[in-house]
């Protein structure tokens, strides 16, 4: 199969007009992943997103939470949409040809442990304690694991229980955004806004905009101030429900946010507020 391989090895001079470190990528013919596990599935990649962490790797700025836990070379791509190509004999509820969205997490269950670590036991597999152990190479997600491959290849493998069938009403483009949106939705559900609360979203890239959508879905009455860098980002933030827009290139951000909080208080409402940092999902 064809796949984009990411390695620390450089494959020639990228030239002055290329992206930083683009020479660490190459298109190559590689074997289809053959992780023989009767509870896993082989998936044909349809769309794979380019995450901020992927861009960081290409620019030589690895994600601190993930970089120590995998070894090059890898096939990137963890924002996944695909079509099932083959099933392990113990996989149930799925069929060949089915479109699926994939949770790329590789935690205790995926690594073959029957007794989960404390984080997995409490529903937090994203911070599993065993990301270097078990039946898989060290990695936190599909797309950083040697055995699984990733969405930047024609095929990859995934656990059957991490595959979620998609209805026909959801198109491929929308479905390709499910993984990053779920990250935002989880953050909002962990710290849901109160009624009419002012929530400040710092950043209006893809994750910032998805945070706005998630906030409005969970608590439609919350008021959102979005700190945006570019006019087109501000327009999209407004379309998704942001009532207040802060221009990070011209406004004094925290002063402007303080003014918004005080204005809410002047209306006789409690000026409580919280902040979402879209770049790191910290709240």
Show where each model-derived region lies.
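Redox-cofactor binding/interface segments in oxidoreductases and associated redox assembly factors
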Residues: 102, 201, 247, 276-277
